Design a protein with these regions (language model features):
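Beta-strand/loop nucleic-acid-binding surfaces
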Residues: 1-4
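ATP-dependent carboxylate-amine ligase
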Residues: 6-9, 16-184
């Protein structure tokens, strides 16, 4: 059973749903068919290869828990290359913003080789990553500058995670990185 499109801790909900299905009398074959046919929707959990890079685009929304879960997937992605966490700020955290972004930075240090943080809380993410010993952690307040730096550092075979709050428009950074046209 190959469930590669949905990796890591993010599969726990699918396992719970499968267990409920079994309890309600569904056959294991029907449940397996449902799991195998899973397709990511919109800007969530899109894992693919393009231009020699492994891309994990999860740009719809973000929270500290979601950041940790997607970073754990990045950490488990196959390949001989490095792992880049390209993370936008998590908006609407209120009083928890500083700690939430530091937490995301610490998780990036655990699962990635480099952090490219973007947005008003990028410095807090970088601080969290450096607390855990990550040397390659950078803060940007401009997506164009982030993409230029990322293009210098990332090489074919590397895995890149793009994630952030909807307002950070991380899909735009991904499109720029891949050389696609983007709206201003």
């Amino acid at each position: 059973l190959d469930c590669t499109p949905s990796l890591g801790m993010l599969t726990i909900n699918a396992l719970a749903a499968a267990a409920v299905g079994l309890l309600l009398g569904e056959t294991p074959e029907l449940i397996a068919q449902g799991l195998v046919s899973y397709q990511a929707s919109g800007m969530r959990q899109n894992i693919y290869e393009q231009d020699g890079y492994q891309i994990y685009a999860d740009c719809y929304n973000a929270s500290p828990d979601a950041m940790e879960a997607t970073l754990s997937v990045l950490g488990g992605m196959a390949g001989d290359g490095r792992r880049f966490a390209v993370l936008g700020s998590m908006l609407e955290l209120g009083d928890y913003a500083e700690e939430g972004h530091r937490r995301a930075g610490r998780a990036a240090a655990q699962y990635a080789d480099a952090l490219y943080a973007y947005g008003p809380d990028a410095a807090a993410m970088v601080a969290g990553a450096r607390e855990k010993g990550m040397e390659h952690a950078y803060a940007f307040d401009d997506q164009t500058a982030l993409v230029a730096a990322l293009r210098e550092d990332a090489k074919k075979g590397d895995a890149l995670l793009f994630k952030g709050s909807r307002g950070m428009r991380m899909e735009r950074a991904l499109a720029m990185f891949l050389g696609e046209e983007v709206e201003a």
